[in-house]
Amino acid sequence: MEKNCNSVAGHAGTLVKASSRQADDKAGSRVPPGGHLLQTNKTESQLLPCASPSDPVHWTNEIVPVVADTSAPAEAAPDQTVSDGEQLTRAPDETYYQRSESLAEPPAENELPAGRSRRRRSRWCLGCGCFEQVKTVVLRMLMTGFEKYAGVVYDHPWLFIMVSLLATAGMSVGIFLRTPESDVYTLYSLSGSPSQVTKEHLLDVLPPDRLLFVLLTGTSNLVTRETVTRIDSLLQGIESITLRRDSVTTDEFNHRLVSHDRSPFPETITFQDICAKDGSGKCQVQSILDLYPSSSAWGVMPIASASWPVVTNPVTHKVSRLDAILGKITTSVRLAEQGSGRPALTVVEEAEAMLMRIDLRGETIWKPYTAAFEKLVLDYVLGQDFGPDISVTAKAERSSYDELKRVSTLDVVEWLRLCAAVLVVFLYTSVVNSSKTHRTKLVPSAMGALASLLGYLGGAGLVYLCGVRHTTPAEATPFLAIGIGVDDLFVIINAYSLTYLHPNPKERVVDAIRDAGLSITITTLTNVITFIIGALSPYYSISMFCIITAGALTWGYVLCLTFFLAGLSLDARREARKEPLSYSLFWRFMPRCCRKSSYEPQLSPPLPLTAAASGLEEMRNESEEIVTADQTPPTHGGDLLTTYQLAALMVLYKKHTCQSRSSQPARRLFDRRDGTGTEETMSTPVPEDSERDRTNQKSCGTQVSTGIVDVRETGQDAASQRRLSSHIRDMTTQESIMLLKNFEKEMEQNPEKLLKLYHPEPLGNPGRGSRRFFRDYYGRFLGNTFVKATVLVIFAAVTALAIYGATTLKFGLSLKNITPQASYLRDFYSLHEDLFPSYGDEVTVFFAENDRWEDREVQMRYLQMVKELSEQEWAVVVTDGMSLFLQHAMPSLHSGNRKEFLALLKTWLEGDPIGQNFSTFFKFSFDNLIVWQFRYWMPHRDNTTTLYYWLKEGKDIVSAGKPYFHGEVHTALAVIWESDPKILPFTLTNLSIALVCILAISLLLIPDLTSAIIVVLVVSLVDLWLFGFMALIDLPLSMISMVNLLISIGYSVDFTIHVAHTFTHCVGASRKDRMVETMIVMGAPVTHGMLSTLLSILALAGSPKYILEVFFKMMFMVIVFAYTAGMVLLPVVLTLLGPFHPHGKRESGKAIACDSSAQLIDMEPLHGTGKEEHGVGV
């Protein structure tokens, strides 16, 4: 291939030999449209378009020389830009060559050029050689597909915009038709868990009652006649509530009743129909009224207990516990009176809280009507006004469902938060991608932010239309979709900004998508795979959330490649016409008579030759020729320089500039004549120390401003600029080809030669300032030895702190926490825990097996089990009718006589005043005991893991009675507690699967094993930090925080993959240089993606919803930790341990860039004008 290029170059030199003398008089050269410019001041030579040194040359068209008019006067290039203190000069072109119609194919292994050794198979994988070949083919196919697709979108932008908007509008209907799932046990329990099986068994044999509580609290004593009277009035109001049977059409979860037979129920359902009855046939209502024998004693007769806290009503014989009815009690003790026989009494003096408990029917067939009746009772109770000194709150079985349903719906505040997030992201993307020139990307940025929002509406809407129910965690989906979606916007605009060297707008868009399409596909795929793995979670709420979010991200990706890409195409046309944005958006559509001014693109006057030759910064001018937006784009040839080589040149130029400034005295350049020459005078030399200080403070860190500048501070810049311009003029075609072929070897041996290839980046190009910042400041800062040591020490301390925190991590999800802060239910939970600490969760122990209770040994074993259970600190109150019966009747019972046992038991439950309190605990058939139960209460605890282990201990005690009896233990929240000990294994398993899957995909970008291992370690560190700091901020590990840990994998891999992949392909002479090059290429997109996501997540700050609060805290830590790991820790580690192959062993030439790549100079003729289009850049 080298011979081919050399022969063609020699032929081109012969063709233009006649015009060489005229070229010597010109300060610069105009770039020929068919190739890449590199020329000499002796011979006007043309660098032909050719593939990289590793590719063969395939000429599809003959070379047609076009000789320019040599008599034309010298003029500056129409497109002159200045960056980093350089000035590029051009002269009219001499020849033009057509480029190949297709990408050059790589040579076969046996057709490698002379001197090129075959690529050795990697040591760590025997099949890596084959894998690399397959990967190369697949990547080329994907990039070619993106290239062709982008061309279609560019040709039909309005079609793609309208189709995408119409499709999104149709899909977004599902947002408004979604069905929320509010069953807390369905949302946050494990399907098929042991507790779930026990619950279903209990519902079949002995359905528990539905409990309704009314809690009154005051600032003073409530045990007064007035308060008791008002409680009686409240109870009478509840008993007077009625419910129309036909008005009930849905259940408590808002699911429509299908095939429901209403005939067994009365048309008007009253409280007597809906309440659960006790042994005497009365409704089971427990209140302070049960403590008085009659209404005349209300608030007058003292409430006293001989065996605290149990008290028995002397008239009704109803047994009550005072500490379960009254809260914040003040008592006094009355000593026993020997003469009257009155025992010692504990008397209630004051109580500041009262609790009323109402039992409602729990049968499955009655549930729809019971739930509807509960809603009426809640509305009535919460609407009562007891005055300023008494507050009322309540809790029903359906309360948690109602409140979860309320928080599962986007209210006005949430819509405002969402709009604020969209607005903030829109403003941020617009600011960072805007400039004062025609290159501003304000409109594409706005369309990109809008595309991320439309992605949520369309993707989530389609998922809802498919039958997926909306869950509470899905409230965070729109914020995540917006934050993650705009990342693709920054990557594409960054790739587009690096294609400014193309004269044709269509080619710019095509090349940007060809280079960035694979990158955004990989990152989107990693995020979607993360959520797909989360969708396999056994938790219903998390599974639905992951499905909804995956759909939103997928559709956002589609809109990015349709809606946003079409907008970028339209804006690229405008940029090619050099139209100001205001003209395109506003003045163009006004009548000519009303226009502010007629816009006619004007060419800027050419620069004087002397200014171009001297390279003075103050003579900077940005003038370009107008390009027809719809002209036929040129076909693609091989890239001469990849993005990584361009970044290496930027670093090399900066080092060269700093060295030249510190080693040479200042020069004053001033044109004393008529613009045809310059005169240089030497100023007083600057001391080395002061010059070095000025270099560190200004020259090596800041951009030289335009305009008239102090030559005492910029004279050295002019010298280096003039020297670089001279290098460019003196470079021959043969030398340029050899430099490009041996780029990496020259980087190691003769780096100053490569400065001849360095070209400036135009002003106003999006991301230009960010790239300069990461090169001049951030990269140099991280490369400092002291800074690297400090970073490692800080992250070691953070890791140690995280390890400590991980050892104190708590688990579980409290029902109180997922309740909205402004909810009456949350107030009830808080007050009940404070005023009634011993009465937390009610536990039911039931026996549904046909055990031999008539046997004496079984009875003794049972009494022993109850005694052991009662002695536990977590079994505060044990209410057991069977124990009381056995203590009462055991002396008269004969072992083994079942008929006698059942008869005495029935008699005790029906006739004994004490036994009547337990009659509803037993269920008989005609001649047998079917099932019976007893209850105990556990104290309140915030740690649900502790409650789970208490329940487990209770199960173990009951299970120890086998084979004498078979009992089962159940409490309502057990199905949620049971997930606590399993949440950590589930989390670690999902994290491992996600990490393996994502790294498998990432190997497409990082073939180096060392880099892959570093990525694994860094991502693992991020997860470790999250585990530790969750404990430090008192955030338990639950199913909600678990999904954030999965998200952290995606974020961490995105950041680290971008950095590690770029570092692997950089070509700097040292690890430090490659780290700086990595920051130049990926620093801005990664940083902007992080900040946009962070801004969208900030909209969740201060949300009253616990789940959104958890998402905000977790996502904030995820973003901060992932970014600092990828942009601070990883670059430092790579400078120490990163892959560093000697240039002689690396494959020179073109490297397939999966993120972004740019051509150094890429030209094509301007059809119909006879002029050429020029571009330079980095």
From Swiss-Prot:
Q: Which Pfam families match?
A: Patched
Query: Which reaction equation describes what this protein catalyses?
Result: cholesterol(in) = cholesterol(out)
Q: How does it sit in the membrane?
A: Multi-pass membrane protein
Domain (SSD): residue spans on this chain = 414-570
Arranged from A to Z, the UniProt key words for this protein are: Glycoprotein, Lipid transport, Membrane, Transmembrane, Transmembrane helix, Transport
Entry's localization field: Inner membrane complex
Annotated TM spans: 157-177, 412-432, 448-468, 478-498, 516-536, 545-565, 789-809, 986-1006, 1013-1033, 1037-1057, 1080-1100, 1114-1134
**What positions does the record give for glycosylation?**
41, 433, 621, 917, 943
**Mainly localized where?**
membrane
Annotated family:
Belongs to the patched family.
The protein's role, per its UniProt record = Likely facilitates the efflux of cholesterol and gangliosides from membranes. Plays a role in the regulation of lipid homeostasis.
Q: What is this protein called?
A: Niemann-Pick type C1-related protein
